[in-house]
Amino acid sequence: DSYLNSMKKSIQANDGAYDLIDGYAAVIGGAYADGLMMNLHDVSNLRPTSMWWSQLAVNELTVNGKLFGIPGDLSLNLWKNIHVMFFNKTVLENNGLEKPYDTVKNGKWTYDKYLEMNVGVARDLDGNGEVSLEDSFGSIYYDDLSFDNFHNAFDYSYTVKNDDGSISLDLDEQIMVDTYEKIRSLAYENPDVYYNKGGKVEGTIDVFTQNRALFFASVLGDAEKMRDMNSDFGIIPFPKLSEAQEQYKTTSRDNRSMFCIPTDVKDADFAGLITEALCVASNRGVVPVYYDTVLKGKVARDSESAEMLDIIRSGLNFDFAAEFAIQTGRAGFILRDAIYYDKNYTTYYNESKKMFNKAFDRFVSYYMEEK
């Protein structure tokens, strides 16, 4: 709050102190609603449709022709926070399973296939008859944010765009109920899956690096924590809902950057030029080094994982409701919250829909104002 408030005060005072704002994605939307950021589509020398900006994000986050913040190659945290699945090759071999790379490439890496590979992997290693972090598992999750990514992986959006350029919530659909039931069962009922509810990555990742979990659902940046892992591991995308789905999809967590130009900027054209140039330079000189040298060269243990990274990157997606969940009554966090609090999806939605719609429509109304 102090970060956002300090920035707001400066812009409202017309200080002209900032040419470019590297906004914290989770909260920067509060400045959009206050009319403090420029429409990036109107900034000369800035080209949001260029490949170094995330095009799926530009398409999803543009409403009524307005885009107030943009993620792109200007910051590596976009890619470090992208959701992926890691698999442990030692655990894979010990359970007589095949590497899932060909399954991914053939478009057959589905949720059902993922569940199938988990079956029978869990072991009560300490023999106490209770499930704990001392045991082994098919999959391990340390927070509800990874569960939240399944709605992206299943290629479903929380919103729908309307003919008048506006956007509306679309949470009351059977696919959301079905997704909730699948993920709730995964979190609370699957004997081969451990949900370290409220846990931290530091304690949970040890289960994976110590060969006690086949799959670890997390973010790509956590691969850097596995450099000293003795066993080899692979990186694959989250599974699709079915083979009929054309593309593997994922998203990047909201503790990343969103780049904005404030309305009190002294020279918007210059700010756009520098922002574009920085993003181009990072796209050509920083991101390739991170992927080819750090990830593909030092972290990824095989060429197949390097190929998987390209597939994952191509499916980076964003959801307007999830992107601005804090500003819209947590409507875009409905899946993670229902899972975390173990509440029936339909009941939770019916209890919250009036609040969701009111907060969401209020936020969207700024996009619909004529400027």
Describe each region flagged by the PLM.
Residues 115-119, 149-198:
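Glycine-centered hinge/linker elements that transmit conformational signals in sensory
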Residues 60, 124-135:
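Acidic, glycine-anchored loop motifs typical of Ca2+
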Residues 1-25:
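Early extracytoplasmic/lumenal segment of secretory-pathway proteins
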